[in-house]
């Protein structure tokens, strides 16, 4: 996502206006809490029931008044503006907290890029910062980003829109720590072919674990929370009867397993969006591109339309290298323009069926897929990246994110086309 931020060097009247705005926000919070809760002092409000799209009733988390007030004052430290259109890059925690950050900042400042998607919780389940020791996820913390506040202050100064990436259900760390929240193969936590484990989307405690991390990212000052791996493991439909796992509140025998998976994934997104509303952040979800081509992906539980109804931004991962023969294209990696063009047409049709469609901001490819083998891939560079951007723009999609797992991005690209 890309963003333009206001100058952080406030002087004179601008400084005074900021102070006034902060007090207005605090006053509004106090009045709102007085109207809508029974909170007194540091007491917590009773849990409120929230009915999810699937009909499940779920309790929203308690909120403490002092924490809530502090949260909003804290958010007002930074002033970010949503950009004309988000044009962003993926940034690992190692890059964000190391020397690579300066190189990536230079790339953004010298081009029309304007956003960074920064790992806060990576796909191993590790946090890229050190939370307070009292947090339930504290032991997942690392020192990759030693001073998140310093990072965000620098991004504010440079007008780089900050997005926190939170990987949800792919979490080897939590699966091993809490096997009862995962999938068991006999007595062991199940692993995929790459040795990675997932936690169980049916388990409400897993939802809360991740939502609390997202809330902390919002409190840090990130303007958007991007949830990734919001799904069951790939191919789960082939092993759902072999593995041992809780189905939580999704045990209704009248509903088939595919629909239970879809309901659990969609319910998590809806719940997370609701929980994050008081923080004033946008919520986005990464989703497999092929999910938009199906009524729903049977194994992983992703329904493109249902998820899109509960987010501000939908980010389909449409890397040409990740498609088999599709849209009449035998070898999609060799034809990035055509693949992205055809996908964008289909996605526009799907989103056009929704009453309130989210912003479309696809992930596009800035890497070379050598693993596809000779004759099935091409070297990706300036032309291939621009072809994908041009295809999106021709279909009215002006936002995009670039993926390169090592954060080595192509130079000389015209990102505005």
Language model segments and positions:
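Active-site-proximal loop/short-helix segments
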Residues: 172, 176-180, 223-256
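Aromatic-lined carbohydrate-recognition surfaces of secreted/lumenal glycan-active proteins
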Residues: 90, 163-167, 226, 259-299, ...
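Active-site-adjacent "subsite" loops/lids of carbohydrate-active enzymes
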Residues: 77-96, 169-216, 386
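Substrate-binding cleft of secreted/luminal carbohydrate-active enzymes
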Residues: 311-325, 336-341, 346, 353-417
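Aromatic-lined carbohydrate-binding/catalytic grooves of carbohydrate-active enzymes
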Residues: 111-145, 237-245
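An active-site-proximal structural segment forming one wall of the substrate-binding cleft
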Residues: 97-100, 107, 111, 195-230, ...
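Glycine-rich, aromatic-flanked loop segments that form ligand/cofactor-binding clefts
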Residues: 115-117, 147-191, 224-229
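Catalytic domains of carbohydrate-active enzymes, especially glycoside hydrolases
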Residues: 102-125, 219-224, 313, 392-398
């Amino acid at each position: 996502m890309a963003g333009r931020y206001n100058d952080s060097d406030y002087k004179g009247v601008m400084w005074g206006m900021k102070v006034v705005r902060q007090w207005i926000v605090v006053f509004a919070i106090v009045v709102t809490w007085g109207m809508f809760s029974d909170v007194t002092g540091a007491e917590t409000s009773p849990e409120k029931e929230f009915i999810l799209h699937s009909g499940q009733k779920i309790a929203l988390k308690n909120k403490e008044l002092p924490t809530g007030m502090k949260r909003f004052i804290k958010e007002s430290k930074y002033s970010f503006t949503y950009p004309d259109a988000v044009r962003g890059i993926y940034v690992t925690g190692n890059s964000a907290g190391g020397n690579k950050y300066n190189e990536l900042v230079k790339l953004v400042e010298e081009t029309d890029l304007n956003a960074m998607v920064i790992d806060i919780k990576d796909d191993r389940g590790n946090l890229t910062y050190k939370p307070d020791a009292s947090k339930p996820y504290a032991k997942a913390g690392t020192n990759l980003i030693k001073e998140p506040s310093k990072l965000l202050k620098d991004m504010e100064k440079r007008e780089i829109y900050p997005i926190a990436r939170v990987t949800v259900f792919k979490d080897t760390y939590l699966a091993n720590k809490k096997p009862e929240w995962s999938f068991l193969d006999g007595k062991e936590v199940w692993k995929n072919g790459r040795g990675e484990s997932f936690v169980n989307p049916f388990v409400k405690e897993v939802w809360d674990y991740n939502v609390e991390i997202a809330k902390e990212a919002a409190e840090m000052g990130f303007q958007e929370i991007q949830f990734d791996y919001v799904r069951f493991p790939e191919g789960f439909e082939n092993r759902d009867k072999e593995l041992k796992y809780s189905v939580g509140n999704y045990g209704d025998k009248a509903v088939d397993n595919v629909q239970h998976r879809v309901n659990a994934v969609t319910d998590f997104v809806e719940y997370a969006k609701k929980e994050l509303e008081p923080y004033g952040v946008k919520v986005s979800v990464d989703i497999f591109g092929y999910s938009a081509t199906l009524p729903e992906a049977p194994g992983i539980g992703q329904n493109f339309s249902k998820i899109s109804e509960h987010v501000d931004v939908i980010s389909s991962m449409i890397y040409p290298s990740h498609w088999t023969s599709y849209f009449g294209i035998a070898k999609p990696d060799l034809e990035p323009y055509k693949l992205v063009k055809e996908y964008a047409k289909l996605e526009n049709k799907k989103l056009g069926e929704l009453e309130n469609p989210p912003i479309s901001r696809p992930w596009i490819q800035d890497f070379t897929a050598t693993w596809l083998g000779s004759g099935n891939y091409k070297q990706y560079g300036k032309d291939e990246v621009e072809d994908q951007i041009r295809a999106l723009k021709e279909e009215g999609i002006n936002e995009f994110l670039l993926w390169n797992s090592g954060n080595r991005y192509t130079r000389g690209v015209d990102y505005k086309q």
